[in-house]
């Protein structure tokens, strides 16, 4: 029984995820920070973001996935895991690149929070203007 491990790092906003894919003897488990997917992300929309690369490549129940994720919030962590999983899947099988690229999962989402400016309330929100 050949047990292979593949690794991918994903980032989104301030979150970073390390994804380990193990093939061989597997039953489709997804473990995030030593908790199951349902325990770590109880909402269905974040679960679907994470599982998306596996569904597209039809590998949902064929691989065991172990993830450690740090920083950011729920959305950022889900995006980081998705990106890391895509990179690990590309290590697992380079032929998946075309399928994952067509859906837009290979490219990192580089959007970051814009910094707050001096004299403004937020990044772009100005104080209320009074003519008189």
Swiss-Prot record:
Q: InterPro entries given for it?
A: Ribosomal_Su5_D2-typ_SF (IPR020568), Ribosomal_uS9 (IPR000754), Ribosomal_uS9_bac/plastid (IPR023035), Ribosomal_uS9_CS (IPR020574), Ribsml_uS5_D2-typ_fold_subgr (IPR014721)
Q: Which GO terms describe its molecular function?
A: RNA binding; structural constituent of ribosome
Entries under SUPFAM superfamilies matching the protein: Ribosomal protein S5 domain 2-like
Which keywords has UniProt assigned to this entry? Ribonucleoprotein, Ribosomal protein
Sorted alphabetically, the Gene Ontology BP terms of this entry are: translation
Quote the cellular component terms of the Gene Ontology held in the record.
Answer: cytosolic small ribosomal subunit
Asked whether the UniProt record includes Cell division among its keywords, one would answer no
Q: Does the keyword Kinase apply?
A: no
Family designation: Belongs to the universal ribosomal protein uS9 family.
Give the protein's recorded name: Small ribosomal subunit protein uS9
Provenance organism: Blochmanniella pennsylvanica (strain BPEN)
Gene name, Swiss-Prot/TrEMBL: rpsI
């Amino acid at each position: 029984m050949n047990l292979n491990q593949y690794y991918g790092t994903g980032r989104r906003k301030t979150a970073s995820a390390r994804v380990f894919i193990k093939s061989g003897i597997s039953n489709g488990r997804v473990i995030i920070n030593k908790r199951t997917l349902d325990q770590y992300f109880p909402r269905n929309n974040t679960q679907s973001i994470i599982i998306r690369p596996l569904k597209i490549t039809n590998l949902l129940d064929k691989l065991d996935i172990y993830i450690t994720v740090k920083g950011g919030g729920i959305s950022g962590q889900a995006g980081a895991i998705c990106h890391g999983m895509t990179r690990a899947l590309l290590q697992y099988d380079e032929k998946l690149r075309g399928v994952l690229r067509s859906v837009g999962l290979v490219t990192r989402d580089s959007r970051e929070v814009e910094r707050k400016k001096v004299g403004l309330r937020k990044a772009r929100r100005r104080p209320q203007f009074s003519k008189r």
